[in-house]
Amino acid sequence: GIGKFLHSAKKFGKAFVGEIMNS
């Protein structure tokens, strides 16, 4: 459902921000 999608999006967003911070 949408909740699962939002959870995945949040996880992906965190990873994305982490990549930006590390570069």
UniProtKB/Swiss-Prot annotation:
Expressed by the skin glands. It comes from the Eukaryota. Keywords: Amphibian defense peptide, Antimicrobial, Secreted. Its main location: secreted. Transmembrane segments: none annotated. One of its GO terms (biological process) is defense response. It is found in: Secreted. One of its GO terms (cellular component) is extracellular region. Antimicrobial peptide. Belongs to the gastrin/cholecystokinin family. Magainin subfamily. This is Magainin-R1. It comes from Xenopus ruwenzoriensis (Uganda clawed frog).
